[in-house]
Design a protein with these regions (language model features):
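Short amphipathic alpha-helix adjacent to the substrate-entry channel of hydrolases
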Residues: 173-193
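Short beta-strand/loop motif that positions the catalytic acidic residue
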Residues: 345, 350-353, 357
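Histidine-bearing beta->alpha loop at or near hydrolase active sites
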Residues: 199-200, 384-391
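Mobile cap/lid helix-loop segments that gate and shape the active-site cleft of serine hydrolases
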Residues: 254, 289-341, 347
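N-terminal cap/lid segment of alpha/beta-hydrolase-fold proteins
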Residues: 119-154, 205
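Alpha/beta-hydrolase active-site loop
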Residues: 203-224
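Short beta-strand element of the alpha/beta-hydrolase
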Residues: 156-167
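Primarily recognizes the serine-hydrolase "nucleophile elbow" in alpha/beta-hydrolase
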Residues: 217-292
Length: 410
């Protein structure tokens, strides 16, 4: 048991998405910034950005530019920001953040500042697609939101649900950052629904599954108003989003025909799924018998404990109580592990997983695909050589997702 827990601990606490060398330079840059060695801080940031390449986030560029400004080297700050202004992941929020960033105030009197802002605005506009936000459900006095991204050209009338969840955290920032990865669908006429769920740590995985089912039903029920065909709905996601997508793809088609809300009287089934590096079996995490469902310490270290903090309402006290009974937790664990729900009537499923993934073991997709084959479910599986837990590592294979939906959402 000790060895099992240790392996799970090591797996869950590994860095998530970028090479450790880049992280080391960022940590060094942060430390140098604190002691006001701004020039060497900027140099360290630059090296981290160089190593991380095209996956470098907005905040790293901002930090590097800030250090160059404080080192009295505005030319280097403008150089970095001009690189950022050409980034095809830039959002409108990024533009607003650059425009108002106190760290960049010293550049605002420079004649190059307005040119920079214009370039950032132009790129952010080019990266944007028509969109509309909807409240797809309500709970605990709050609304559940989804954003419909619409193609700039003619719609093909088909829908792809994109599950916005990483480590079972879900928020609107993921929506903004995720538009870049949805271009392959939007440019071929798909409508993409970016679904935000009740997020951990407040809501656990079973709550998120119910939210996602509600989202599918909402889209299907309102298909005409949304401009899509209710019988051509696919689902996609990565990591936790991939896990939740597979839960939906393998779920049965139970419909509550007596539900008071008509939205809840329609199906939550999808017609195809495509996912990246998904967790599929919480009882065999990396190898047989490594159950992570009840290992609280490693879950806390990996910042996913809230996702497994199962709670039930005590109607007498009106208090949500944590489920601590092992038998009860194991029952829930099986219900949220899609590998145990695979059946011959499941829709076509496409999975890409890297063999260098140190967050979700490759074994999770291997055993799941074996189960799909055993059940006769149409599937496609790509093991990306050298691929880590990062969607950018999955290219160009990731671009095959749209072909999958083209084929199975006919």
């Amino acid at each position: 048991m000790k060895n099992t827990t240790l392996i799970i601990f090591c797996t869950l606490t590994t860095f998530f998405s970028i090479a450790q060398n880049a992280n080391q330079f960022y940590r060094k840059a942060d430390s140098l910034y604190i002691i006001k060695d701004f020039k060497n801080s900027a140099i360290a940031y630059n090296e981290g950005i160089r190593l991380q390449g095209t996956t470098t986030g907005f905040i790293r560029y901002l930090s590097a530019a800030s250090s160059w400004i404080l080192a009295n080297t505005p030319d280097s700050a403008f150089y970095l920001l001009n690189i950022l202004s050409q980034n095809d992941k830039l959002t409108q929020s990024d533009y607003k953040n650059i425009e108002s960033a106190k760290e960049l105030a010293a550049l605002q009197s420079d004649k190059r500042w307005k040119q920079l802002l214009a370039a950032v605005q132009k790129q952010a506009d080019a990266n944007t697609y028509p969109q509309e936000e909807f409240v797809y459900g309500r709970k605990d006095g709050m609304g559940l939101l989804m954003t419909q991204l619409k193609p700039k050209g003619k719609s093909n009338g088909k829908a792809i649900i994109s599950v916005q969840a990483g480590s079972w955290f879900s928020n609107f920032t993921l929506v903004e950052r995720g538009v870049y990865y949805k271009r392959q669908y939007l440019d071929k006429g798909y409508n993409v629904f970016m679904v935000v769920l009740g997020s951990q740590p407040r809501y656990a995985i079973p709550d998120q599954i119910e939210d996602l089912k509600r989202a599918v039903r909402y889209i299907r029920y309102n298909a005409k108003q949304l401009g899509i065909d209710p019988d051509h709905v696919g689902i996609e996601g990565g990591s936790a989003g991939g896990h939740l997508s597979l839960v939906i793809a393998t779920a049965d088609d139970k419909i509550n025909v007596t539900a008071s809300d008509p939205v809840d009287r329609v199906s939550s089934r999808v017609q195809a799924a495509a996912v990246l590096f998904p967790p599929t079996d919480f009882f065999n995490w990396g190898f047989p018998g490594a159950a992570m469902i009840n290992v609280r310490g490693p879950q806390i270290q990996a910042r996913v404990y809230g996702a497994f903090d199962f709670r039930v309402l005590n109607n007498t006290t009106a208090i949500y109580e944590t489920v601590t009974d092992t038998t009860a937790r194991n029952k829930i664990g099986k219900e949220i592990s899609p590998i145990y729900a695979v059946s011959p009537d499941d829709p076509p499923i496409f999975i890409i997983h890297g063999d260098a993934d140190m967050v979700v073991p490759l074994q999770q997709s291997q055993t799941f695909v074996a189960k799909l084959k055993e059940a006769g479910v149409t599937n496609k599986y790509i093991i990306k050589k050298g691929g880590r837990h990062n969607p950018d590592d999955m290219k160009p294979e990731l671009d095959q997702f749209v072909d999958w939906f083209d084929k199975y959402l006919k």
